[in-house]
Amino acid sequence: SSPRKGGIRLMEALLETKIFKVSVERLLLNGGQTLYMVGIALLIGTVIGTLLALVLVLCRKGGLVENKVLHSIVSLYINVVRSVPFIILLVTIMPLTRAILGTTIGSTAALVPLVVYISPYLARLIENSLLEVSPGILEAAQAMGATTWQIIRCFLMPEALGSMVLALTTGTVGLLGASAMAGYCGGGGIGDLALTYGYEKMNTPLMIVTVIVLVILVQLLQMAGNRVSRRLREHR
């Protein structure tokens, strides 16, 4: 129908509109790639990071299931990965990325190094959150005959949730920066936009806008994280 065709043409015209010499379609595509990388990597990284943090807390000296060997292995792994700059980690594990996904280029391929990078980072942050829980609460749970799983699910995690939200907020900010670096190696996203269409083409206004967008995203994330954490602490 004519109205429908007119709407399609209008949408195409809007997508082809250029802002700082870059089409709106390209801006939306790269922005979506960043959200995709950060969202998926954060989800997987949070699960792995939480499991690693629980191992560190439960298996430490005096923990609920003390295991010095397992604690030392996990702690060493976390320290080693965290000590490697992300850009070096990105290049180093390219063979692993290729083995898993068959390619090292694209937003999906960037998920592998991003998850490897963020998991140990979140593990340390979540470990600190879990260690903030009063030992008296755990001792009371043990005295009531609660199992290790019940202590984790009903006492440890709920008490640490407010602090964990702040930890995840910090991790998300770090992940946002890492995703921008991933763009340098073909990961796409805002970083790729700034480098390919900004730096390499001497498009300074686009680079400035990219930085401003990243700053705004970080501020919004931090504000949201602080607010959620405060509410969780109040209703604990």
Can you describe what each PLM-predicted range is?
Residues T148-S179, G225:
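Transmembrane alpha-helices
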Residues L29-M37, R82, F86-S119, L206-T210:
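Loop-to-helix entry region at the N-terminal start of transmembrane alpha-helices
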Residues V55-T92, L114, S119, R124-N128:
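Cytoplasmic-entry segments and transmembrane alpha-helices of multi-pass inner-membrane transporters
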Residues L10-A41, N67-S72:
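Periplasmic/extracellular loop-to-transmembrane helix junction in inner-membrane transport proteins
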Residues L27-L58, L168:
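Transmembrane alpha-helix signature in integral membrane proteins
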Residues A178-I208, I212-V213, R233:
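Glycine-rich helix-loop "coupling/hinge" segments at transmembrane-helix boundaries
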Residues V55-K61, M207-R236:
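C-terminal transmembrane helix and the adjacent membrane-cytosol boundary/short C-terminal tail
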Residues L130-A160, E200:
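Short helix-to-coil transition segments within interhelical loops
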